[in-house]
């Protein structure tokens, strides 16, 4: 059957509505009837030019090429616009409205939640709308997208990947408004120093070059900076020159500088066989959450927006600790605990034991070390499989009052969810960075006898489509074993 449009076709569209994940919706009438077009990073009120990347009988997915007309409500920005902040020109209140409406639509359609008016507790905004990130990754490329001519040129570039490409970068010449003003307003000087060495930037299609990535991690607690320059091993790096440059540009805030060798052809910072070493200063910066300090290395996973993460964890604490102190002998479990951030925060504020469980032994070692450093005593960490935990530690059977889940974006697999059920917890606090997979998992949790009691959204990433969610589920009494 002939379709209304074909792959590669360029369309001019008026965006009328929003779908979850930052997809603008255009509705068209064709010879074959109503047709829906989704355009990533477009939003209502805009007229855009977009290219079809996938076409079905009644809908198409498009890549945004350019905005032809802005929406009436869009704001003028004091920052350089970047691909990673598609909503930067949208008033924050409207961003919250879109995130709420599109997320709740998922819980209705995918999760089958019929009582959202009763359980939804609103959206928690980020304390900071601008300069909230604590880490930024900049890419080098020999292919630069010129923002003035909107063309690709052969040139030394350092900045962000141009939207829809993996090979071309847009030079960052000014503060983007998301990270650190000092770092980003002087990044062009780092680019010029690297270019002056005569060594080439990475050429993604040809898979060759020298300079690959510059990663900067920042402590929001004290402003300290950790810098990692990623190169191939094709030539020696002028280490002294690079260290002098970074310290001159960013001063006493620089706490450590690393050099990572990465000869992998893939477009990622971490190399499978490369090595990373400290060439000046320390290997970590210190971040503080709820009065606890955490040493964060360049490779550590840590919340990107610490100020908003404090609000997220405050919501988790309120739910996890509710009623537990009136139940002597009960325990709270932090499942998939990683390096134990949530578990330590809970333990600091609880008068009950907290148990952290993760299948990765190194993560558990790091969690124990961090708890010792913070003086948190009523938390125990175990390297164990969730499904076997009660068999290996029968002393906790019947004592798990609340289990806190914080899985990756993919959510919880059915197999893992069955393991969670074996823990026989009375309550589950489910933290999610992807409401779509959380909504899917709520269906299975409901069939296993858990009822959704409350749901709250948390805006961790202003100016993007991302939103996090915290859900409380309780075992239905008449189904409890």
Residues of each region from the PLM?
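Short, aliphatic-rich beta-strand segments
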Residues: 216, 223-232, 293-297
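Extended interfacial segments that mediate partner engagement and assembly in macromolecular machines
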Residues: 65-203, 221
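Short beta-strand micro-motifs enriched in acidic
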Residues: 51-55, 139-145, 217-221, 474
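Terminal RNA-binding accessory module
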Residues: 1-78, 160, 165, 380, ...
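Peripheral terminal and linker regions in Fe-S/redox and tRNA-modifying enzymes
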Residues: 57, 66, 135, 147, ...
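Internal alpha/beta scaffold segment
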Residues: 166-212, 233-259, 265
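Rossmann-like S-adenosyl-L-methionine
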Residues: 2-9, 20, 24, 234-481
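Conserved loop-to-beta-strand segment in the C-terminal subdomain of adenylate-forming
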Residues: 59, 222-226, 465
């Amino acid at each position: 059957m002939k379709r209304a449009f074909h792959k590669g076709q360029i369309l001019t569209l008026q965006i009328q509505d929003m779908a979850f994940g930052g997809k603008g919706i255009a509705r068209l009438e064709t010879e074959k009837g109503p047709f829906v077009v989704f355009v990533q990073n477009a939003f209502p009120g805009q007229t855009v030019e977009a290219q079809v990347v996938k076409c079905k009988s009644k809908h198409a997915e498009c890549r945004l090429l350019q905005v032809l007309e802005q929406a009436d409500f869009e704001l003028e920005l004091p920052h350089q616009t970047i691909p990673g902040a598609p909503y930067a020109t949208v008033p924050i209140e409207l961003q919250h409205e879109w995130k709420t409406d599109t997320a709740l639509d998922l819980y209705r359609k995918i999760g089958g939640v019929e009582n959202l008016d009763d359980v939804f507790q609103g959206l928690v905004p980020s304390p900071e709308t601008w300069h909230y990130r604590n880490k930024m990754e900049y890419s080098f490329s020999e292919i630069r997208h010129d923002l003035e001519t909107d063309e690709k040129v052969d040139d030394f570039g350092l900045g962000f990947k141009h939207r829809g490409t993996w090979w071309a970068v847009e030079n960052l010449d000014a503060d983007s408004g998301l990270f650190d003003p000092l770092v980003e307003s002087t990044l062009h000087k780092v680019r010029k120093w690297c270019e002056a060495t005569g060594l080439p930037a990475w050429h993604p299609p040809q898979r060759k070059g020298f300079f690959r990535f510059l990663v900067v991690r920042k402590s929001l607690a004290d402003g300290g900076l950790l810098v990692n320059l990623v190169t191939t091993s094709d030539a020696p790096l002028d280490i002294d020159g690079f260290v002098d440059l970074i310290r001159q540009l960013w001063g006493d805030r620089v706490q450590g500088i690393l050099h990572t060798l990465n000869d992998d052809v893939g477009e990622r910072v971490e190399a499978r066989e490369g090595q990373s070493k400290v060439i000046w200063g320390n290997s970590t910066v210190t971040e503080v959450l709820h009065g606890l300090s955490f040493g964060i290395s360049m490779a550590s996973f840590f919340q990107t927006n610490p100020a908003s993460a404090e609000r997220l964890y405050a919501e988790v604490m309120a739910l996890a600790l509710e009623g537990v102190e009136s139940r002597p002998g009960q325990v709270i479990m932090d499942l998939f605990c990683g390096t134990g951030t949530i578990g330590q925060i809970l333990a600091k504020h609880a008068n009950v034991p907290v148990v952290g469980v993760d299948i990765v032994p190194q993560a558990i070692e790091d969690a124990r070390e961090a708890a010792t450093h913070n003086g948190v005593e009523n938390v125990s960490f175990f390297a164990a499989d969730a499904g076997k935990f009660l068999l290996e530690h029968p002393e906790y059977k019947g004592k798990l009052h609340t289990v806190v889940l914080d899985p990756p974006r993919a959510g919880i697999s059915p197999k893992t969810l069955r393991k969670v059920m074996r823990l026989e917890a009375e309550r589950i606090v489910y933290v999610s960075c992807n409401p779509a997979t959380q909504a899917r998992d709520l269906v299975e949790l409901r069939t296993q006898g858990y009822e959704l009691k409350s749901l709250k959204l948390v805006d961790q990433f202003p100016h993007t489509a991302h939103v996090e969610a915290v859900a409380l589920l309780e075992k239905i009494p008449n189904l409890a074993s």
